[in-house]
Design a protein with these regions (language model features):
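Alpha-helical, largely C-terminal catalytic domains
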Residues: 1-165
């Protein structure tokens, strides 16, 4: 991985939930209640970030923070004009693994986000702190990846089941 990709992945993982500092976390079952709701929530989050967080930031890193928090779970690059372009993991590795493309493994950030939620739920359940919602959340994460599905080179199903067993 090029140096910029490593840096971008780190900061994307670190800042991807920044909008929730203002909007609060909306749990996935609520966000996924309708097909349109995730886009509506994302639009509101972006508006609030621009209104309440951006004015508090130094100008020199505002655009990078927006890059890290926008479309955070998509693999993406910036083209020669600075436009964000979604690309496959294969393209990230074969064509865009150079600093000049500002590459980000957004799907890897998503896996890490799910993994941390799974571990939090699983550890709580194993220590007797549980509820039907926590169990359903844990199970939902386990079932969200197919057995033979590989995301950004990772068999997430196997990873998740290895963690909880």
């Amino acid at each position: 991985m090029c140096e910029r990709r490593i840096i971008n992945n780190f900061f994307s993982a670190l800042f991807h939930d920044l909008p929730e500092a203002v909007t609060r976390d909306i749990i996935s079952p609520v966000k996924q209640a309708t097909d349109d709701l995730p886009n509506i929530v994302k639009k509101i989050e972006n508006e609030i970030v621009n209104k309440e967080l951006v004015p508090l930031m130094e100008d020199f890193f505002v655009q990078e923070i927006i890059d890290f928090t926008s479309d955070e779970f998509s693999n993406r690059i910036k083209d020669a004009n600075g436009n964000v372009v979604n690309v496959s993991w294969e393209e990230l590795n074969e064509k865009y693994n150079e600093d000049k493309f500002f590459p980000i493994d957004g799907k890897l950030v998503r896996i890490a986000d799910h993994l941390s939620a799974l571990m939090e739920a699983d550890i709580s359940i194993k220590h007797g702190i549980t509820s039907i919602h926590l169990q359903n959340g844990r199970d939902g994460l386990l079932y969200s990846y197919k057995e033979d599905e590989v995301v950004n080179g990772i068999n997430v199903y196997n990873l998740f089941y290895d963690i909880v067993s």
